[in-house]
Amino acid sequence: MIKIIYLIVLLVLLFKNNHIIIKADDCPFPQIPIKTLSGTWYDDPDHASCGFEKLTGPLGPGNRLVVALGSKLFDKGANCGQCYDVTSPFNNKTITVMATDSCHDAGYCQADNHFDFYKEAFDLLGSPSGVISGNSGLSYIKVPCPTYGNVKIMMKDGSNEFWTSFLIFNSRILIKQVSIKLSNSQQFIDLNRQPQGNYWPSTNMVSGEFEVRIESIGGEFIYVKIPSIESRKIYDTGNQFSADGCVGNKYDPYAPFQITSNSNNILPPSLYIIFLISILFLIINNIFSNKY
């Protein structure tokens, strides 16, 4: 009985007020090559609907290998920030591009699988013409984005103590949900993504510190506490979502993200935690066996 009590106390001390570091072992999205990609090009990438502004600015991907997705792929902004490996049938090169905009051409952009490439990216494909048909052999596959550093969050222009809107960027994989816990509440409230965009507005803000919970499409969570609302203020979350199991870009498999103990959706502890608990139990059992 005493051993059981000691074990319970040990578990409480282990998990109370600590972060559980885990990582996903499977790629969080299907990686199925699509070989019916059509393509066109455009020449103004810095005024895109996903909100990343200048591509080489503080919110952008840091390069100009970007695409505007056809309306079906764009999916009202749900695929903002998704990266793709595109393989050309003309020179067999593969380039990695990020979706930063929606394609607005009423003709080409209505195709099921259409990329409107920024000119610099399009030129790398070696196409003999400015339009690539869907039966040319041009193909793509979803991949994690080749980002560096952590997921970041910014509050939109015009944010104030009553209203703000969050842009989540520099993530390896897509964001599924953003939630907020205000200073006068103990519960997280899910936000709705802005239609046709990449911002998550909140219209019921109050003064004081609040917490943002970011969920990836892989079911991982990142938490960040923000002291107050400040227009265009950028916060580094200190963590990055994992992309283990994906083909394409390779990342540090030990890059951590955090799921805090007060989450509404706690995932199972990692094998490391289970192993640690087992070792500690054996130590306690050995101590009491020798003593009694």
From Swiss-Prot:
<feature type="glycosylation site" description="N-linked (GlcNAc...) asparagine">
    <location>
        <position position="92"/>
    </location>
</feature>
<keyword id="KW-0812">Transmembrane</keyword>
<keyword id="KW-0732">Signal</keyword>
<feature type="domain" description="Expansin-like EG45">
    <location>
        <begin position="47"/>
        <end position="150"/>
    </location>
</feature>
<feature type="signal peptide">
    <location>
        <begin position="1"/>
        <end position="24"/>
    </location>
</feature>
<feature type="disulfide bond">
    <location>
        <begin position="50"/>
        <end position="80"/>
    </location>
</feature>
<keyword id="KW-1015">Disulfide bond</keyword>
<keyword id="KW-1133">Transmembrane helix</keyword>
<comment type="similarity">
    <text>Belongs to the expansin family. Expansin A subfamily.</text>
</comment>
<feature type="transmembrane region" description="Helical">
    <location>
        <begin position="268"/>
        <end position="288"/>
    </location>
</feature>
<dbReference type="InterPro" id="IPR036749">
    <property type="entry name" value="Expansin_CBD_sf"/>
</dbReference>
<dbReference type="GO" id="GO:0016020">
    <property type="term" value="C:membrane"/>
</dbReference>
<feature type="topological domain" description="Extracellular">
    <location>
        <begin position="25"/>
        <end position="267"/>
    </location>
</feature>
<dbReference type="InterPro" id="IPR036908">
    <property type="entry name" value="RlpA-like_sf"/>
</dbReference>
<feature type="topological domain" description="Cytoplasmic">
    <location>
        <begin position="289"/>
        <end position="292"/>
    </location>
</feature>
<protein>
    <recommendedName>
        <fullName>Expansin-like protein 6</fullName>
    </recommendedName>
</protein>
<dbReference type="InterPro" id="IPR051477">
    <property type="entry name" value="Expansin_CellWall"/>
</dbReference>
<comment type="function">
    <text>May serve to lubricate the movement of the cellulose microfibrils during cell growth and wall extension and/or may serve to maintain the fluid state of the slug cell wall.</text>
</comment>
<dbReference type="InterPro" id="IPR007112">
    <property type="entry name" value="Expansin/allergen_DPBB_dom"/>
</dbReference>
<feature type="disulfide bond">
    <location>
        <begin position="83"/>
        <end position="145"/>
    </location>
</feature>
<keyword id="KW-0325">Glycoprotein</keyword>
<keyword id="KW-0472">Membrane</keyword>
